[in-house]
């Protein structure tokens, strides 16, 4: 059930307000986590947290909570995906500040994948556990998702060491197990496009030197967040398009 299905305008507004406040509270805590997770040797590389940035994170959390409960409902799937977004938010800002993605954050995402797989199994086998229902992502899709992007990135790094960071590879590995291969591929290419656009802008403005790099984790995080809503749909349409192109009607 989503807040959109609540009867009465007052009830829907109250539900939205409650989710908005809850989301803001959770993301307010994230503004503290973002500056405490990095290791001590990285602290000198962190700039002082800006009030406007923190306020933006908090407001984003409130809006996201309303969107997620409206789209995914109030079951555990919506909760897991919202927590996934929360982790991606932490990944984004820590990577922006330190050019590194803490290993523990990727572990948390992988654990979310394990939990979602267990919930999916329980909801399919135990009567009356529909509230535990998750998207039907098969174990095969999850296993393929773990390597469909992370393995090519790893091979690229073997030949071009500065091509991608190890944190980026681990992020796609963990996210692949949570989302499955379709959403993971779509999320990666969305991130790749966004990162490419940013790189071109930096090149035009010459804000980065030839040997300088920018964090790619934030773009991957945005791509993965977007794909929560439409990743499988985009991939399914793409597959149907390819099939139609390969087998045109005579």
Ranges and model annotations:
Residues 1-250:
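A membrane-topology feature that recognizes alpha-helical transmembrane segments
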């Amino acid at each position: 059930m989503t807040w959109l299905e609540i009867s009465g305008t007052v009830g829907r507004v109250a539900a939205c307000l409650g989710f908005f406040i809850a989301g803001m509270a959770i993301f307010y805590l994230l503004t503290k986590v973002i500056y405490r997770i990095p290791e001590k040797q990285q602290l000198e590389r962190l700039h002082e947290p800006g009030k406007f940035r923190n306020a933006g994170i908090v407001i984003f959390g409130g809006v996201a909570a309303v969107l997620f409960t409206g789209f995914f409902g109030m079951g555990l799937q919506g909760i897991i995906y919202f927590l996934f977004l929360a982790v991606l938010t932490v990944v984004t800002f820590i990577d922006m500040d330190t050019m590194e993605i803490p290993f523990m954050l990727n572990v948390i995402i992988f654990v979310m994948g394990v939990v979602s797989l267990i919930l999916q199994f329980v909801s399919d086998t135990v009567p009356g556990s529909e509230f535990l229902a998750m998207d039907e992502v098969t174990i095969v899709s999850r296993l393929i998702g773990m390597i469909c992007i992370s393995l090519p990135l790893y091979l690229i790094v073997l030949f071009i060491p500065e091509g991608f960071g190890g944190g980026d590879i681990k992020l796609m590995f963990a996210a692949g197990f949570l989302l499955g291969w379709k959403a993971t591929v779509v999320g990666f290419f969305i991130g790749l496009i966004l990162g490419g656009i940013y790189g071109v802008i930096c090149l035009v403005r010459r804000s980065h030197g030839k040997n300088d790099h920018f964090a790619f984790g934030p773009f991957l995080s945005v791509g993965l967040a977007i794909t929560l809503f439409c990743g499988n749909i985009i991939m399914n349409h793409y597959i149907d398009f390819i099939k139609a192109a390969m087998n045109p009607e005579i």
